[in-house]
Regions:
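Short beta-strand segments at enzyme active-site cores
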Residues: 1, 53, 83-84
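N-terminal binding-site loop/beta-alpha segment at the start of enzyme catalytic domains
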Residues: 1-19, 136-137
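Short loop/turn motifs at secondary-structure junctions
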Residues: 15, 47-50, 78, 102
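Repeated polar recognition positions within modular binding domains
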Residues: 1, 27, 87-89
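Extended hydrophobic secondary-structure segments that form protein cores and membrane-embedded regions
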Residues: 21-24
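Beta/alpha (TIM)-barrel catalytic core signal, keyed to glycine-rich beta->alpha loops juxtaposed to Asp/Glu
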Residues: 58-190
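Glycine/small-residue-rich loop that forms an oxyanion/phosphate-binding "nest" at active or ligand-binding sites
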Residues: 10, 26-73
Length: 190
């Protein structure tokens, strides 16, 4: 969706600096040269001089080479921050100890049913931001009707989604909730 995002930002009339743009290097582009090429392609599709955050999608393939490409682009100012996603503690520790610039962000599935407390502590030890992918558990396990979340929400006049987001934020986890509904977007900020 990089082309569409780039076009939308350009057409919005809002200064580029007001947006925080994240992209990922996919497994199919792993390895130093291929990853670097894909970063340049992302910049071109987005019609931008820099990307705020670039992540490795998963720890498969030559992810060390991929990370070296991201470090290079970071040093060149093409990326403002670099990190990983779906790196559980063992893989995270491994890469954090053997790269020049440790990951600044690790995006991993995190929600009230899968809190990733051990992973969080590991990231914290490396000054890495823990970013939640799927803070609503993708709606699984009847998430929005969960009895505990609903009860807490009633107490504070909030939705179960708001309760779940608040829990993560209070525990120093960055959240990226997904919705296409304007009213839910507004609720997610409340």
């Amino acid at each position: 969706n990089e082309e569409a995002v780039g076009n939308a930002i350009r057409k919005s009339g809002i200064p580029r600096e007001e947006f925080f743009v994240t992209s990922k290097v996919w497994i199919s582009n792993s390895g130093e040269e291929q990853a670097y090429k894909s970063i340049l392609e992302s910049l071109e599709k987005l019609q931008m001089d820099y990307i705020d955050l670039m992540l490795i999608h998963q720890p498969f393939g030559d992810y060390y080479g991929t990370y070296r490409a991201m470090e290079r682009a970071y040093k060149e100012g093409k990326l403002k921050a670099i990190g990983v996603s779906n790196f559980y503690p063992d893989r995270f520790i491994d890469i954090a100890n053997f790269v020049e610039i440790p990951p600044m962000v690790n995006q991993v599935e995190t929600h009230v049913f899968q809190q990733q407390k051990k992973a969080h502590e590991v990231m914290k030890g490396y000054n890495c931001i823990h970013e939640s992918w799927g803070p609503f558990a993708e709606g699984r396990k009847d998430f929005f009707n969960n009895e505990t979340l609903v009860e807490i929400g009633k107490k504070y006049n909030k939705t179960s989604a708001q309760v779940a987001l608040r829990y993560l934020i209070q525990n120093d986890v960055v959240v990226i909730p997904k919705t296409v509904h304007k009213d839910r977007m507004i609720q997610n900020f409340d």
